[in-house]
Amino acid sequence: MSDLHNESIFITGGGSGLGLALVERFIEEGAQVATLELSAAKVASLRQRFGEHILAVEGNVTCYADYQRAVDQILTRSGKLDCFIGNAGIWDHNASLVNTPAETLETGFHELFNVNVLGYLLGAKACAPALIASEGSMIFTLSNAAWYPGGGGPLYTTSKHAATGLIRQLAYELAPKVRVNGVGPCGMASDLRGPQALGQSETSIMQSLTPEKIAAILPLQFFPQPADFTGPYVMLASRRNNRALSGVMINADAGLAIRGIRHVAAGLDL
């Protein structure tokens, strides 16, 4: 039996991409899964696909009341909350400082930070009492942009650096009751969109990047799928497998940190 059997897991942005892969994985692990999802169509799809195995709540991660409504439903359903996974986010499609008009930069900043940073903070606030009671955990999705430049423009990259600070501060504030960690995936096949303020709300990340371009820059030389990143979340959520980690950011970057100066990887001819 999985360590996560009957554990109560709350994931934001569970309707597509990494969020959907996490929903699938935690259900496979026997967990009671809930998600807060902005898209009504995706909520309906989740309910149709997973039935009683999913509690899908339509709502916005920038709205505390929506979070509280979801937590109330989770506690009614499961009687507890063991892990909160802040995952919903938006990307800036590499919108640069020089080429982005000042007024667009300002509105884009507020929209992107509201989702990528405030959304995590509000989720932590709504979930903290239940997680303190269960001595559970929080896990936040980062990005390779939390470590390196060029994984987005200044808006996205700064938001992910801000999220690392939030993880460390929450890990400090909530210890010893709640473990708080992060996972930073590299580029993958997903439907990640951009801010409406930048005219990117209908543009997905795969319209800006190709599988070939992503695989070429990774030393492991493959194009990741969302399911490839779910393992670290399962480990961090497990009390048995993660008794000691808090304030830790797992850099799941397919080897980006060890790229060579002359070659992406030295073993390409092996």
UniProtKB/Swiss-Prot annotation:
Signal peptide: none annotated. InterPro entries: BphB-like_SDR (IPR047950), Dihydrodiol_DH_HcaB (IPR023643), NAD(P)-bd_dom_sf (IPR036291), Sc_DH/Rdtase_CS (IPR020904), SDR_fam (IPR002347). It catalyses: 3-(cis-5,6-dihydroxycyclohexa-1,3-dien-1-yl)propanoate + NAD(+) = 3-(2,3-dihydroxyphenyl)propanoate + NADH + H(+); (2E)-3-(cis-5,6-dihydroxycyclohexa-1,3-dien-1-yl)prop-2-enoate + NAD(+) = (2E)-3-(2,3-dihydroxyphenyl)prop-2-enoate + NADH + H(+). Keywords: Aromatic hydrocarbons catabolism, NAD, Oxidoreductase. Pathway: Aromatic compound metabolism; 3-phenylpropanoate degradation. PROSITE patterns: ADH_SHORT (PS00061). NAD(+) binds at residues 10-34. GO terms for molecular function: 2,3-dihydroxy-2,3-dihydro-phenylpropionate dehydrogenase activity. The keyword Oxidoreductase applies. Pfam families: adh_short. One of its GO terms (biological process) is 3-phenylpropionate catabolic process. It is an enzyme of class 1 (oxidoreductase). The active site is at Y156 (proton acceptor). Its EC number is 1.3.1.87. Substrate binds at S143. Belongs to the short-chain dehydrogenases/reductases (SDR) family. Converts 3-phenylpropionate-dihydrodiol (PP-dihydrodiol) and cinnamic acid-dihydrodiol (CI-dihydrodiol) into 3-(2,3-dihydroxylphenyl)propanoic acid (DHPP) and 2,3-dihydroxicinnamic acid (DHCI), respectively. This is 3-phenylpropionate-dihydrodiol/cinnamic acid-dihydrodiol dehydrogenase. It comes from Shigella flexneri.
